[in-house]
Amino acid sequence: TSTESMQILSSALTTHTKLVSKEFFNNENNMNKFIQNINKLMAHGSYVTKRQSTKLLASLIVIRSNNQLMNTYINSLDNLKLIMVLMTDKSKNLQHEAFNVFKVIVANPRKSKPVFDILVKNREKLLKYFETFGLECQEPTFIDEKEFIVQEIESLPRIVSSNNIDGNANVTTSPTGNVAAAQDM
């Protein structure tokens, strides 16, 4: 079954992490194929496949020896978009698994420009989403992680519209009120 297959894959990739990292994820071709395939499973699989694939990815990117996998995955705009879609799935369990990947993306202090830009563009929607996300979960670790992610999102520049001589223009303001011109996305 697909559940057994995912358990075997998960076990193979998480049991000997240094070996897997050195022999599998250090090969860029292998890593890119893995990302492409795990994304297919997360996007188009059954509920169980989506959840297990997302859970596997979340567990792999937090393993220190898989740093190259983590950096490659979390700096991709397409990967961020997929994770954001999964966070809006009707299944609370899948939302939580996707959050475990999303928090790594948001916590990254060296986000790629495309990832940073999409987070800025969706700042207000994300803050609204997190107002109700995970309210049923009283686990202290989850609550702390959610609070940290909300703080990180709140610290992103805010895009506001204002009129100038040329008409409407997007302007980015930092949480402290500093203003800078925003690039169109």
What are these regions (language model features)?
Residues I8-T17, M42, S53-N67, L86-M87, ...:
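Hydrophobic residues within the alpha-helices of tandem HEAT/HEAT-like
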Residues T1, K18-G45, L69-L82, K111-Q138, ...:
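Alpha-helical scaffold repeats of the Armadillo/HEAT/TPR superfamily
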Residues T1-E4, I8:
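Eukaryote-specific intrinsically disordered, low-complexity regulatory regions enriched
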Residues T72-V106:
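Active-site/pore-lining binding-face segments in mid-to-C-terminal subdomains
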